Amino acid sequence: MGLEEQLPGGILLSTVEKVAGYVRKNSLWPATFGLACCAIEMMATAGPRFDIARFGMERFSATPRQADLMIVAGRVSQKMAPVLRQIYDQMAEPKWVLAMGVCASSGGMFNNYAIVQGVDHVVPVDIYLPGCPPRPEMLLHAILKLHEKIQQMPLGINRERAIAEAEEAALLARPTIEMRGLLR
């Protein structure tokens, strides 16, 4: 006989983290950060056919101070990397990053000195979305996966510790331009 059976009807038991996660996942405001071809598919996702507003993303925010999700859509050049980091630092907590497309995830076909070989070398990434370019349906699926991740995310000091560990791992990772393998 649990506590739920002893309580009168109409009482809901939950934790603060679950309630906060539910509210956060349904009110994301993405920042506009389209860098290449993937940005076209990201814009199509906001159109009437796919209607990203169904998932709480009523509008794309033009200022990082009002955004809590950065969708990096496309390749990131070495000159754009500091700007990307500055925009990420200006976003208020809690914030999440989605790497959209192969170029944002791993540099894509641009394996040279001018392109960052994965945006995770600049900012911590929460969700990687493969494809060249990924379809709007795939972006919606990635957003739903991010919703699941947000709902399970801890609050307070536990979240700060998780963010610090992710950023430390990103900074210590060896750049893929320096890796040697079958193609180099």
Curated annotation (Swiss-Prot):
Binds 1 [4Fe-4S] cluster. One of its GO terms (molecular function) is NADH:ubiquinone reductase (non-electrogenic) activity. It catalyses: a quinone + NADH + 5 H(+)(in) = a quinol + NAD(+) + 4 H(+)(out). InterPro entries: NADH_UbQ_OxRdtase-like_20kDa, NADH_UQ_OxRdtase_20Kd_su. It holds the Pfam family Oxidored_q6. Keywords: 4Fe-4S, Cell membrane, Iron, Iron-sulfur, Membrane, Metal-binding, NAD, Quinone, Translocase, Transport. GO terms for cellular component: plasma membrane; respiratory chain complex I. Its EC number is 7.1.1.-. [4Fe-4S] cluster binds at residues 37-38, 103, 132. It is a peripheral membrane protein. One of its GO terms (biological process) is aerobic respiration. The keyword DNA-binding does not apply. It is found in: Cell membrane. NDH-1 shuttles electrons from NADH, via FMN and iron-sulfur (Fe-S) centers, to quinones in the respiratory chain. The immediate electron acceptor for the enzyme in this species is believed to be a menaquinone. Couples the redox reaction to proton translocation (for every two electrons transferred, four hydrogen ions are translocated across the cytoplasmic membrane), and thus conserves the redox energy in a proton gradient. Belongs to the complex I 20 kDa subunit family. NDH-1 is composed of 14 different subunits. Subunits NuoB, C, D, E, F, and G constitute the peripheral sector of the complex. NCBIfam families: nuoB_fam (TIGR01957), PRK06411.1 (NF005012). This is NADH-quinone oxidoreductase subunit B. It comes from Mycobacterium tuberculosis (strain ATCC 25177 / H37Ra). The gene is nuoB.
